Amino acid sequence: MTLASQIASDLLDIKAVYLKPEEPFTWASGIKSPIYTDNRITLSYPETRTLIENGFVKKIKEEFPEVEVIAGTATAGIPHGAIIADKMNLPFAYIRSKPKDHGAGNQIEGRVVKGEKMVVVEDLISTGGSVLDAVAAAEREGADVIGVVAIFTYELPKAEKNFAEAGVKLVTLSNYTELIKVAKVKGYITADGLRLLKKFKENQETWQD
């Protein structure tokens, strides 16, 4: 079993991911979605957590060997980022969604040295907007962001476009395509459910038509 399929399997088993193609969820953006993900739950399962952190370390060493500092997005990327930084013996910082409105008004907590090569850790990629905002904030502080890593991506075309336009490399441990394949094999969804889930990936607006 590949890392992507093992993580997909774990996410389903611990109910970090719910699939309900026949009774869709409504995302904050208003999109009706057959999938809902809460990767924070992975922190409560040591075996899954270890699988994820070891996967991150392996991917970062392969894809970004020149990394000098790990940063997590607030709040979901913080615990994973801190564990990764510890495993790799690297400095750690975290990036707020917006600057503090008191004190020094920091958006980045931790010391970032100008020009340091940074990898940003996120738990989930939908459109990529929030993590790319974090990347921009880190770069304003002088970091050289060489990439983003995440546990899971919905593989939405908008995310692909956003990362391409930002010129930021994205590496994920698992993805939507792998997850729905594993879900069908493990009996989490029916053949008709799989069809709807594939349609959602193709077009998030018309998949229910």
Curated annotation (Swiss-Prot):
The residue stretches assigned to a coiled coil in this entry are none
Reported EC number(s) for this entry are 2.4.2.10
| A single BP term in Gene Ontology | pyrimidine nucleobase biosynthetic process
Pathway, per UniProt? Pyrimidine metabolism; UMP biosynthesis via de novo pathway; UMP from orotate: step 1/2
Q: Which PROSITE patterns match?
A: PUR_PYR_PR_TRANSFER
Keyword hit for Aminoacyl-tRNA synthetase = no
Q: Could you tell me the keywords of this UniProt record?
A: Glycosyltransferase, Magnesium, Pyrimidine biosynthesis, Transferase
**PANTHER family, per the entry:** OROTATE PHOSPHORIBOSYLTRANSFERASE, URIDINE 5'-MONOPHOSPHATE SYNTHASE
Summarize subunit and interaction data from the UniProt record for this chain: Homodimer.
Recorded family membership: Belongs to the purine/pyrimidine phosphoribosyltransferase family. PyrE subfamily.
- NCBIfam families recorded for this chain? pyrE
Could you identify this protein by its name? Orotate phosphoribosyltransferase
